[in-house]
Amino acid sequence: YKGHGTDRALLGGILGFKTYDDRIRDAFKIADSKKINYEFVATDLGEDFHPNTVKISFVYEDHEEYVIGSSIGGGNMIIVDINGIQVEFDGTHPTLLFRYNEQKGIISEISSILYKNDYNIESINTIKDDLTEIVNLTIELDQNLSIDLVKKLTTNSKFLMAKYVEV
């Protein structure tokens, strides 16, 4: 990962840089100046993951979170896991992530809210655990959501988890 600049690119992403941002080459210096602690540890994540996969852990004072993503070639990547929740999205579009107990009408309800607020859905993906009947729903959008709509969609008590990833 060092010879290809992957470490710099990953740190640049954590700093919020776009892939074309010239500051990526100085990501280590910038992270150090912002007092961001980082460490790269080569680890085998197992055969369930693509060989070019990375787990990024975010350690806070009171909790830890992580994201697992894979480089799939051509400068493209896919996020496959967030805090143990199986997902699938590429990070190029604003994304809604939901986890809920299987029930009819959830996708329709969310789609209707988005339609009524003039948002277009780029893609929808569901991953259902047949044993627990828990669904992980990913909705990629064509534009960022308003703060009010994010709040409306992510505070619904029907969801075990609801998050919004802005691009």
Regions found by a protein language model. Give the residues of each.
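Ordered, amphipathic secondary-structure segments that act as subunit-interaction surfaces
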Residues: 17-54
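A conserved regulatory-domain signal marking ACT and ACT-like small-molecule sensing domains
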Residues: 9, 14, 22-26, 40-43, ...
